[in-house]
Amino acid sequence: MTNSLYKKHIISIPELSRAELELIVKTAGQLKAEPNPELIKNKVVASCFFEPSTRTRLSFETAIQRIGGDVIGFDDGGNTSLAKKGETLSDSVQVISNYVDAFVMRHPQEGAARLASEFSNGVPVINAGDGANQHPTQTLLDLFTISETQGRLDNLNVAFVGDLKYGRTVHSLTQALAKFNNIRFFFVAPDALAMPDYILEDLDEAGISYSLHTDMETVIPELDILYMTRVQKERFDESEYAHIKSAYILTAALLEGARENLKVLHPLPRVDEITTDVDKTPHAYYFQQAGNGVYAREALLALVLNESL
Protein backbone atom coordinates (compact mmCIF):
# COMPACT_ATOMS: atom_id res chain seq x y z
CA MET A 1 0.00 0.00 0.00
CA THR A 2 1.32 3.45 -0.92
CA ASN A 3 2.09 5.58 2.12
CA SER A 4 0.37 8.98 2.02
CA LEU A 5 3.66 10.86 2.49
CA TYR A 6 5.19 9.54 -0.74
CA LYS A 7 6.26 12.53 -2.87
CA LYS A 8 4.34 14.86 -0.56
CA HIS A 9 5.54 18.43 0.00
CA ILE A 10 6.21 18.96 3.72
CA ILE A 11 5.49 22.67 4.13
CA SER A 12 3.54 23.08 7.37
CA ILE A 13 2.30 21.01 10.30
CA PRO A 14 -1.45 21.72 9.80
CA GLU A 15 -1.20 19.92 6.43
CA LEU A 16 -0.14 16.66 8.10
CA SER A 17 -2.76 14.32 9.57
CA ARG A 18 -2.51 12.61 12.94
CA ALA A 19 -1.93 9.29 11.13
CA GLU A 20 0.95 10.80 9.14
CA LEU A 21 2.54 12.26 12.27
CA GLU A 22 2.26 8.88 14.00
CA LEU A 23 3.80 7.12 10.99
CA ILE A 24 6.81 9.47 11.04
CA VAL A 25 7.27 9.01 14.80
CA LYS A 26 6.98 5.21 14.50
CA THR A 27 9.46 5.10 11.59
CA ALA A 28 11.91 7.33 13.48
CA GLY A 29 11.84 4.91 16.40
CA GLN A 30 12.48 1.96 14.09
CA LEU A 31 15.43 3.69 12.43
CA LYS A 32 16.91 4.68 15.78
CA ALA A 33 16.72 1.04 16.91
CA GLU A 34 17.74 -0.54 13.59
CA PRO A 35 19.64 1.68 11.11
CA ASN A 36 18.98 1.04 7.42
CA PRO A 37 21.78 2.42 5.23
CA GLU A 38 20.06 1.67 1.90
CA LEU A 39 16.59 3.20 2.33
CA ILE A 40 17.17 5.99 -0.19
CA LYS A 41 20.07 4.48 -2.11
CA ASN A 42 20.62 6.21 -5.48
CA LYS A 43 18.44 9.15 -4.43
CA VAL A 44 19.86 12.68 -4.56
CA VAL A 45 18.61 15.38 -2.18
CA ALA A 46 19.24 19.10 -2.68
CA SER A 47 20.16 20.83 0.59
CA CYS A 48 19.37 24.48 -0.18
CA PHE A 49 20.09 26.78 2.76
CA PHE A 50 19.56 30.42 1.85
CA GLU A 51 20.33 31.50 5.42
CA PRO A 52 22.75 30.16 8.04
CA SER A 53 21.92 27.00 9.95
CA THR A 54 23.97 24.65 12.07
CA ARG A 55 21.80 22.01 13.74
CA THR A 56 19.12 21.75 11.07
CA ARG A 57 21.49 21.58 8.09
CA LEU A 58 23.95 19.15 9.69
CA SER A 59 21.10 17.01 11.00
CA PHE A 60 19.47 16.78 7.57
CA GLU A 61 22.71 16.06 5.74
CA THR A 62 23.64 13.39 8.29
CA ALA A 63 20.17 11.84 7.91
CA ILE A 64 20.44 11.77 4.11
CA GLN A 65 23.81 10.02 4.19
CA ARG A 66 22.92 7.55 6.95
CA ILE A 67 20.03 6.12 4.93
CA GLY A 68 22.04 5.88 1.73
CA GLY A 69 21.27 9.06 -0.15
CA ASP A 70 23.56 11.61 -1.77
CA VAL A 71 23.38 15.30 -0.96
CA ILE A 72 24.17 18.32 -3.13
CA GLY A 73 23.55 21.96 -2.39
CA PHE A 74 24.80 25.01 -0.57
CA ASP A 75 24.77 26.56 2.90
CA ASP A 76 25.30 30.18 1.88
CA GLY A 77 22.54 31.48 -0.36
CA GLY A 78 24.43 34.73 -0.85
CA ASN A 79 26.93 32.94 -3.08
CA THR A 80 24.37 31.40 -5.43
CA SER A 81 23.43 32.67 -8.89
CA LEU A 82 20.04 33.51 -7.43
CA ALA A 83 21.71 36.14 -5.26
CA LYS A 84 24.61 37.22 -7.49
CA LYS A 85 22.90 37.20 -10.89
CA GLY A 86 19.37 38.08 -9.88
CA GLU A 87 17.83 34.70 -10.68
CA THR A 88 14.39 34.21 -9.16
CA LEU A 89 13.73 31.49 -6.59
CA SER A 90 11.16 29.90 -8.91
CA ASP A 91 13.69 29.66 -11.76
CA SER A 92 16.37 28.21 -9.47
CA VAL A 93 13.97 25.56 -8.18
CA GLN A 94 12.87 24.58 -11.68
CA VAL A 95 16.48 24.10 -12.77
CA ILE A 96 17.58 22.18 -9.65
CA SER A 97 14.50 19.93 -9.87
CA ASN A 98 16.10 18.30 -12.92
CA TYR A 99 18.99 17.04 -10.79
CA VAL A 100 17.38 15.75 -7.60
CA ASP A 101 14.70 13.56 -6.03
CA ALA A 102 13.83 15.96 -3.18
CA PHE A 103 14.56 19.44 -1.86
CA VAL A 104 15.37 20.44 1.72
CA MET A 105 15.09 24.23 1.89
CA ARG A 106 15.62 26.95 4.47
CA HIS A 107 14.87 30.51 3.42
CA PRO A 108 14.47 33.82 5.29
CA GLN A 109 11.29 34.69 3.39
CA GLU A 110 7.96 33.49 4.77
CA GLY A 111 6.19 31.38 2.17
CA ALA A 112 9.37 30.53 0.24
CA ALA A 113 8.96 26.78 0.70
CA ARG A 114 5.39 26.85 -0.60
CA LEU A 115 6.51 28.94 -3.57
CA ALA A 116 9.27 26.42 -4.28
CA SER A 117 6.75 23.56 -4.19
CA GLU A 118 4.75 25.26 -6.95
CA PHE A 119 7.76 25.27 -9.31
CA SER A 120 9.51 22.01 -8.40
CA ASN A 121 7.91 19.92 -11.17
CA GLY A 122 6.56 17.40 -8.67
CA VAL A 123 9.85 16.97 -6.80
CA PRO A 124 8.92 17.06 -3.09
CA VAL A 125 9.99 20.11 -1.08
CA ILE A 126 10.71 19.77 2.65
CA ASN A 127 10.56 23.05 4.54
CA ALA A 128 13.57 23.42 6.86
CA GLY A 129 12.33 26.83 8.04
CA ASP A 130 10.85 29.80 6.18
CA GLY A 131 11.34 32.98 8.15
CA ALA A 132 9.15 33.19 11.26
CA ASN A 133 6.50 31.05 9.59
CA GLN A 134 6.98 27.27 9.92
CA HIS A 135 9.69 24.80 10.91
CA PRO A 136 7.84 21.48 10.58
CA THR A 137 10.79 19.11 10.98
CA GLN A 138 11.60 20.63 14.39
CA THR A 139 8.06 19.69 15.38
CA LEU A 140 8.54 16.14 14.09
CA LEU A 141 11.65 15.62 16.22
CA ASP A 142 9.82 17.16 19.18
CA LEU A 143 6.92 14.71 18.75
CA PHE A 144 9.33 11.80 18.45
CA THR A 145 11.10 12.91 21.63
CA ILE A 146 7.84 13.28 23.55
CA SER A 147 6.68 9.84 22.40
CA GLU A 148 10.07 8.33 23.27
CA THR A 149 10.10 9.75 26.80
CA GLN A 150 6.41 9.43 27.69
CA GLY A 151 5.41 6.36 25.69
CA ARG A 152 2.43 8.19 24.22
CA LEU A 153 1.21 11.33 22.46
CA ASP A 154 -2.26 11.36 24.04
CA ASN A 155 -3.11 12.29 27.64
CA LEU A 156 -0.32 14.80 28.26
CA ASN A 157 0.12 18.01 30.23
CA VAL A 158 2.47 20.27 28.27
CA ALA A 159 3.81 23.72 29.18
CA PHE A 160 5.46 26.18 26.83
CA VAL A 161 7.55 28.87 28.54
CA GLY A 162 9.13 32.11 27.32
CA ASP A 163 8.65 33.68 23.90
CA LEU A 164 5.33 32.27 22.73
CA LYS A 165 4.54 35.19 20.41
CA TYR A 166 7.44 34.93 17.97
CA GLY A 167 8.60 31.34 18.55
CA ARG A 168 7.67 29.32 15.46
CA THR A 169 8.58 26.06 17.23
CA VAL A 170 5.90 26.47 19.90
CA HIS A 171 3.24 27.42 17.35
CA SER A 172 3.89 24.35 15.21
CA LEU A 173 4.17 21.95 18.15
CA THR A 174 0.93 23.24 19.65
CA GLN A 175 -0.81 22.67 16.30
CA ALA A 176 0.62 19.14 16.13
CA LEU A 177 -0.26 18.10 19.68
CA ALA A 178 -3.78 19.49 19.20
CA LYS A 179 -4.38 16.57 16.81
CA PHE A 180 -4.06 14.14 19.75
CA ASN A 181 -6.48 13.32 22.58
CA ASN A 182 -6.72 14.82 26.05
CA ILE A 183 -3.85 17.30 25.73
CA ARG A 184 -3.78 20.07 28.32
CA PHE A 185 -1.66 23.11 27.50
CA PHE A 186 -0.09 25.59 29.92
CA PHE A 187 1.15 28.77 28.21
CA VAL A 188 3.63 30.62 30.42
CA ALA A 189 4.80 34.01 29.13
CA PRO A 190 4.81 37.74 29.84
CA ASP A 191 1.85 39.57 28.32
CA ALA A 192 4.12 41.05 25.64
CA LEU A 193 5.10 37.55 24.45
CA ALA A 194 1.81 35.69 24.89
CA MET A 195 0.66 32.94 22.53
CA PRO A 196 -0.98 34.51 19.43
CA ASP A 197 -4.76 34.75 19.39
CA TYR A 198 -5.10 32.62 16.26
CA ILE A 199 -3.56 29.63 18.08
CA LEU A 200 -5.85 30.11 21.10
CA GLU A 201 -8.90 30.53 18.86
CA ASP A 202 -8.10 27.24 17.10
CA LEU A 203 -7.82 25.49 20.48
CA ASP A 204 -11.12 27.01 21.63
CA GLU A 205 -12.82 25.86 18.44
CA ALA A 206 -11.50 22.32 18.94
CA GLY A 207 -12.49 22.27 22.62
CA ILE A 208 -8.90 21.75 23.79
CA SER A 209 -7.99 22.73 27.35
CA TYR A 210 -5.40 25.44 27.97
CA SER A 211 -4.52 28.02 30.61
CA LEU A 212 -2.43 31.21 30.56
CA HIS A 213 0.21 31.95 33.20
CA THR A 214 2.98 34.44 33.93
CA ASP A 215 4.77 32.18 36.43
CA MET A 216 6.06 28.66 35.70
CA GLU A 217 6.78 27.55 39.28
CA THR A 218 3.13 26.88 40.08
CA VAL A 219 2.50 24.69 37.01
CA ILE A 220 5.64 22.50 37.08
CA PRO A 221 4.16 19.85 39.45
CA GLU A 222 1.36 19.14 36.94
CA LEU A 223 3.53 18.64 33.86
CA ASP A 224 4.73 15.78 31.69
CA ILE A 225 6.62 18.08 29.28
CA LEU A 226 8.19 21.48 30.03
CA TYR A 227 9.20 23.16 26.75
CA MET A 228 11.50 26.14 27.35
CA THR A 229 12.28 28.88 24.82
CA ARG A 230 14.58 31.87 24.74
CA VAL A 231 13.24 35.34 25.52
CA GLN A 232 14.78 37.48 22.79
CA LYS A 233 16.69 40.44 24.21
CA GLU A 234 16.28 42.55 21.09
CA ARG A 235 12.53 42.87 21.65
CA PHE A 236 12.82 44.81 24.95
CA ASP A 237 14.62 47.75 26.49
CA GLU A 238 17.37 46.84 28.98
CA SER A 239 15.39 47.20 32.23
CA GLU A 240 12.30 45.40 30.92
CA TYR A 241 14.41 42.57 29.49
CA ALA A 242 16.27 42.07 32.78
CA HIS A 243 12.95 41.78 34.64
CA ILE A 244 11.31 39.41 32.14
CA LYS A 245 14.40 37.24 31.72
CA SER A 246 14.74 36.66 35.47
CA ALA A 247 11.14 35.43 35.66
CA TYR A 248 11.71 32.72 33.05
CA ILE A 249 14.90 30.98 34.15
CA LEU A 250 14.60 27.28 34.95
CA THR A 251 16.82 25.99 37.76
CA ALA A 252 17.24 22.54 39.28
CA ALA A 253 15.60 23.80 42.46
CA LEU A 254 12.38 24.60 40.57
CA LEU A 255 12.19 20.96 39.45
CA GLU A 256 12.25 19.46 42.94
CA GLY A 257 8.47 19.06 43.01
CA ALA A 258 8.18 17.79 39.44
CA ARG A 259 6.68 14.48 38.38
CA GLU A 260 9.23 11.71 37.94
CA ASN A 261 8.42 11.43 34.23
CA LEU A 262 8.78 15.16 33.48
CA LYS A 263 11.17 15.99 30.66
CA VAL A 264 12.53 19.45 29.90
CA LEU A 265 12.84 20.23 26.19
CA HIS A 266 14.30 23.23 24.33
CA PRO A 267 14.74 23.84 20.57
CA LEU A 268 18.24 25.27 21.25
CA PRO A 269 20.39 27.27 21.34
CA ARG A 270 19.81 28.12 24.97
CA VAL A 271 21.30 31.26 26.46
CA ASP A 272 20.65 31.45 30.19
CA GLU A 273 16.97 30.41 30.45
CA ILE A 274 18.02 26.93 31.64
CA THR A 275 20.82 26.91 34.21
CA THR A 276 23.54 24.31 33.81
CA ASP A 277 22.56 22.56 37.06
CA VAL A 278 19.41 21.38 35.26
CA ASP A 279 21.65 19.42 32.86
CA LYS A 280 22.52 17.00 35.66
CA THR A 281 18.91 16.23 36.59
CA PRO A 282 16.99 13.24 35.17
CA HIS A 283 14.50 15.72 33.71
CA ALA A 284 16.92 17.30 31.20
CA TYR A 285 16.40 15.93 27.70
CA TYR A 286 17.20 18.80 25.33
CA PHE A 287 20.51 17.43 24.07
CA GLN A 288 18.94 14.03 23.35
CA GLN A 289 16.09 15.95 21.70
CA ALA A 290 18.56 17.61 19.32
CA GLY A 291 20.08 14.20 18.53
CA ASN A 292 16.63 12.86 17.68
CA GLY A 293 16.51 15.34 14.81
CA VAL A 294 18.58 12.94 12.72
CA TYR A 295 16.13 10.04 13.23
CA ALA A 296 13.02 12.16 12.63
CA ARG A 297 14.52 13.52 9.42
CA GLU A 298 15.67 10.05 8.31
CA ALA A 299 12.09 8.86 8.78
CA LEU A 300 10.60 11.78 6.86
CA LEU A 301 13.01 11.44 3.95
CA ALA A 302 12.50 7.67 3.80
CA LEU A 303 8.72 8.04 3.70
CA VAL A 304 8.71 10.87 1.15
CA LEU A 305 11.07 8.95 -1.16
CA ASN A 306 9.70 5.39 -0.78
CA GLU A 307 6.27 4.54 -2.15
CA SER A 308 5.56 1.50 0.01
CA LEU A 309 7.59 1.99 3.18
Curated annotation (Swiss-Prot):
Assigned keywords, A-Z: Pyrimidine biosynthesis, Transferase
Binding residues annotated for carbamoyl phosphate, in chain numbering: R55, T56, R106, H135, Q138, L268, P269
Reaction it catalyzes: carbamoyl phosphate + L-aspartate = N-carbamoyl-L-aspartate + phosphate + H(+)
Enzyme class, first EC level, given as a word: transferase
PROSITE patterns attached to this UniProt entry: CARBAMOYLTRANSFERASE (PS00097)
Pfam family, one: OTCace_N
Pathway named in the protein's UniProt entry: Pyrimidine metabolism; UMP biosynthesis via de novo pathway; (S)-dihydroorotate from bicarbonate: step 2/3
InterPro entries recorded: Asp/Orn_carbamoyltranf_P-bd, Asp/Orn_carbamoylTrfase, Asp/Orn_carbamoylTrfase_sf, Asp_carbamoyltransf, Asp_carbamoyltransf_Asp/Orn-bd
Gene Ontology cellular component terms for the protein in this record: cytosol
Family stated for the protein in its record: Belongs to the aspartate/ornithine carbamoyltransferase superfamily. ATCase family.
Protein task: Catalyzes the condensation of carbamoyl phosphate and aspartate to form carbamoyl aspartate and inorganic phosphate, the committed step in the de novo pyrimidine nucleotide biosynthesis pathway.
Name of the featured protein: Aspartate carbamoyltransferase catalytic subunit
Species annotation: Vibrio vulnificus (strain CMCP6)
Gene: pyrB
